Amino acid sequence: MVQAISEFSGRRPLVLTVPGLNGSGPAHWQSLWEQSRGDVVRVELGMWDTPRRNPWVTKLDQAIRSAEQPVLLAAHSLGCLAVAWWAELAGQPWGWPVAGALLVAPPDVDRRDMPAEVAGFAPTPRCSLPFPSIVVVSEDDPYSSVQRGFDMARDWGSHFVNIGACGHINAASGIGLWQEGQRLLDRLIGTAEGPMAQGAGLNEILASLTHEEAGLRTI
C-alpha cells in the first residue's frame, strides 16, 4: 500500500461528484462543475428516485476503485451519507484511495419526518472518516439543522463550515457555479497532490483560506 501511495502521490486527483435523492439537475452546482472543470465527473449511482444504501455504496466503491489516480469526493445531500457509509464499510487506510471529501448539506436521515426514500440510509454513520473532509451546512436547510450538521462533522472528524441562509445548497439556492465551494474543493486538491500522511494537510488548507476569500463563516 505504501508503494501504491508513493506511485500516485503528486498526481492531480480525480473529483467524483456524488449527488443525492433525485440526482442533480442541469443548474445544480455539481452539474455545472462537471461541465466547466476537466477534473470533475459524476458517479452514476442509479436509482436516483428510489435510492438504496447498499447498491449506492457498491457503485461508489466501483467508481473509486476504477480511478487510476487519487480521488476526491464532492457529495451533496444524500450523497454525503453514501460517502459516510462507504467509509464505514470499505475500511480504507488514511488518505488512499480517497484523499478527501467535500460534504455539502448532509441530511438528517434519523429524523422521523424525512422522506421515506432515505430511510434506508439511517442510522447516520458515526465513524471518523479516513480522509480529510469538510462539511458545509446552511442555516435554513429544510433537511437538517445547523446543530445536527455540526454533530455529523464532529463524528466524522470533518472541518465544519456554515455558509448562512442558503437553503439546501442546491440549484434553488441560486449559487450557480458556487465559487466558494470550488475554493474549498481546490484547497483539498492542493493537499491531495502532496505527500499523504495521517492528519496532515487539512488544517493548513483551511488556515490559508480566509473568510474574506471564501465568503464563508466557520464555527
Where in the sequence are the language-model features?
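Active-site nucleophile loop of the alpha/beta-hydrolase fold
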Residues: 20, 44-48, 101-111, 138
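Active-site catalytic motif of lipid deacylating hydrolases and related acyltransferases
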Residues: 2, 9-69, 193-194, 198, ...
